[in-house]
Amino acid sequence: MELCAEYVSPDQRRSFVAGPHGTTDGVTTGPSAYVLNAGQVDRDRPAEARSVAGKVTYLGQLRNQLTGLQDDINEYLTLRMEAAKSKKLKTADEQRIEKEINTLLDGGDDEE
């Protein structure tokens, strides 16, 4: 069975497929480094996958894959948010520059 997820937005579509992630200790899940450095303990951290006779159980594999899939999706969405924020800042900066140019062209450079 292949574990997958799909992200759909008005301008983009992206499929995610779980790879052979070997841990339940996700990169983007759990408390932030700031919270941990402040002395908090991650009591909700999932246990590592259990094994029977040296082989990881089916549910353990599923949990590992879900953690990896969640990391992949979180990283992708974080990049999308950063790009949107950058675009918004660029647009605001362009509007400010255009307004300054129009003010100067209209002879408004003596105003203050």
Swiss-Prot record:
Alphabetically ordered keywords of this record: Activator, Chromosome, Nucleus, Telomere, Transcription, Transcription regulation, tRNA processing
Highest classification ranks of the organism: Eukaryota, Fungi, Dikarya, Ascomycota, Saccharomycotina
Pfam families: Gon7
GO cellular component term, pick one: chromatin
UniProt keyword Cell division, yes or no: no
Name of the protein this chain belongs to: EKC/KEOPS complex subunit GON7
GO biological process: cell wall mannoprotein biosynthetic process; positive regulation of transcription by RNA polymerase II; telomere maintenance via recombination; tRNA processing
Main location as per UniProt: nucleus
Compartments reported by the entry: Nucleus; Chromosome, Telomere
Record's keyword annotation contains ATP-binding: no
InterPro entries registered for this protein in UniProt: EKC/KEOPS_Gon7 (IPR014849)
Organism: Candida glabrata (strain ATCC 2001 / BCRC 20586 / JCM 3761 / NBRC 0622 / NRRL Y-65 / CBS 138)
Disulfide bonds: none
Function: Component of the EKC/KEOPS complex that is required for the formation of a threonylcarbamoyl group on adenosine at position 37 (t(6)A37) in tRNAs that read codons beginning with adenine. The complex is probably involved in the transfer of the threonylcarbamoyl moiety of threonylcarbamoyl-AMP (TC-AMP) to the N6 group of A37. GON7 likely plays a supporting role to the catalytic subunit KAE1 in the complex. The EKC/KEOPS complex also promotes both telomere uncapping and telomere elongation. The complex is required for efficient recruitment of transcriptional coactivators.
One GO molecular-function entry: chromatin DNA binding
